[in-house]
Amino acid sequence: MKRVWVATLSVGIALIGLCMYFYGYENTWRLWNIPVFKSPFLDIQLITGTAESLEKGFDPTVNNPYDPGHRIFNYPKVWYLFLNLGIGRRAAVPLAIASLVLFFGTLAVFPKPKDKFAILLLTAVTFSAALMLSYERANVDLVFFASTVIALLLLEVSAPASFLVMILSIVFKIFPLFAIGIYLDKRKNKLPMYAIGAIAFTALYFAVTWQNMKHIFSTTQKGNDLSYGLMVAFDYMEATMGAAFSIPSIVPYALAFVLLGLAVYFGFRQRSQLTDIDLRNLRAFWAGAGIYVGTFLLGNSWDYRFMFTLLTVPALAEWVRHKGGGAIIIARITVIALLISCWYLIVQKWFGTTNAAYNVVYAIDEIANWTLYFGLTYLYIASLPQWLFDELHNFLIRKPR
């Protein structure tokens, strides 16, 4: 089935290219209801524009005039090693193409689809509106999807090499830390030490660069549309209703952590044979689910980050076809929620033609995002190997000598 997946992916990319050639660049993106900017690959231009601002003597964390949107540069300081290489706005298109090639190349390689249903689901997510948004913007997360996949594949050859790729990803973008589930295994071994090492490294990294991290979080654009996260719906209601909508800021966090606790509890109570799938697909699920749940808890994340849910698809495609069990029902609901979330822009285009209809479609999307959050957390816990729970139990009941 691997060849079928690669062929399907290639045909999909070729069809988009042909559509752009005959129908037009902007018109093609609008088929998915993607907001198109005059300047293509807008997100990669944050990097090339910042490099040019830096070269001209500006501090891009305060004033970034060579970025098309004059956006403040809010990446970790280590990015300056790359920015000082002399890249400028002319490099935007080559960098965008390289990012897309890297993304689609690793996407072609990593999954082990079991059947045609898995390929259908992979295709539906790959060419969904949420992911088309990431391609149109050429968002840098395309590179970090690739680095996560590379870390996953290297683990089958060299754990230290995989760990090095993971650490570099964390240094440049932080959130790949949530993918450390790739260092789990069906059988007990020493690989989880790499996950512990990644957590320890990140804690030290935060301690050393704390002021930079605070600046990053405070200046990151937080959307209330084309976004997912625990704050998104509440920010939207506050923006549309104004003073009529006022709740304590703790409420979204309380709701998210209550759902998290319930998902962990029921996932633990109803563990089943979810580990009875290919190990690579299982590790990919832990990585993708970890990134979605982790970034959801950060508050606001743009929809292009749904690209990481691709990592969950091969496992989900197998689980939904299993027979019986609460975990299988949750897996099926999770797949439905994933498809609704990824295709939200299309649903909005078709049905959100009035303010009232738009709000209904928006509400459906938010319900899907929260359902996906619960479902992926539940399945993450339910799919963890039994030896891990045994080790945790032994650690908790261990008596001091």
Regions found by a protein language model. Give the residues of each.
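Transmembrane helices and adjacent periplasmic/lumenal helix-loop junctions
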Residues: 164-183, 298-308
